[in-house]
Amino acid sequence: MALQFTRHLSPNLRVYDNMDELSAFAGAPQGILDLERELMAKCELMFVGGQSLYESKRKRHDNIHVFPSSVDTAHFKSARDRSGDPDDQREISHPRIGFFGVIDERMNMDIVAGISALRPQWQLVMIGPTAKINPESLPRAENIHWLGCKSYQELPNYLSGWDVGIMPFALNEATRFISPTKTPEFLAAGVPVVSTPITDVVNPYGAAGHVEIASSAEEFVAKIDLLLSRPKAHWLSSVDAHLAEMSWDKTWARMMLHIANVGAESKSTREGQLV
């Protein structure tokens, strides 16, 4: 969409950082695919936010690189050492099964309702703003707690009190290419997590045993039961080794290396044209 107010610029280098397939989202602006084609033709370098996006677009650009979601490990890892609960979570009993993120058409509400019904003794703590869906359509039960939007700074305080995290994404066009940032954030917080089989979660996280994969409420319940009883020490050690290579600083350094290389090539080309 930025093309609509940047076409008059003549930069030395253009980079397209593509984090989602926005055209598949509910309410996507008309013409967004045409704008993307124009942008890709103009840009010398392209980054994508996950392997599935890379596979979708790699034949459409000759200098495309994949950078999955990174994580502020120190911020979320602080959840492992905190005690006490925020006021609106303090009276919620355990086990607590938590989610944080935008609550929209990408969430499978049947799975949320199913977990609640199958395990009424579990408490589902749901954090995040509602978007593009009617809040009245959210499943309601005594053990489902919709706590609304929280700030980024507050999130570790909530995650520190959760026993298991869930990512109950629907499998639809809006989730086909997502690489959820909350995956490494859950892991950095030390919260075991169960997800539906989103491609960029199954590989690498599911394949490595860092995230459990489930497709139905019944499967979610079985996986959560497993995680509630499983010791965390070995899992955490493996998770931390994986996260050590995923800081935003390291991701930015790798991006800058590509930018510097392309920038040097562009400068050389411009100087050659002046000779």
Placement of each model-derived feature along the sequence:
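Membrane-proximal helix-turn-helix segments that form the acceptor-binding/catalytic region
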Residues: P29-M46
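Carbohydrate-associated surface elements
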Residues: S52, F67-A79
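Conserved donor-binding/catalytic core segment of Leloir-type glycosyltransferases
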Residues: D88-M107, V112-S116, L124-V125
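Nucleotide-sugar-dependent
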Residues: M107, Q153-Y158, G165-A188, V194-G206
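Glycosyltransferase donor-sugar binding loop
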Residues: Q123-P135
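Nucleotide-activated donor-binding/catalytic signature segment of Leloir-type glycosyltransferases, i.e.
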Residues: I133-L159
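Conserved acidic donor-binding segment of nucleotide-sugar-dependent glycosyltransferases
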Residues: A207-E218, L226-P231
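A charged, aromatic-enriched C-terminal amphipathic alpha-helix characteristic of glycosyltransferases
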Residues: K232-I259
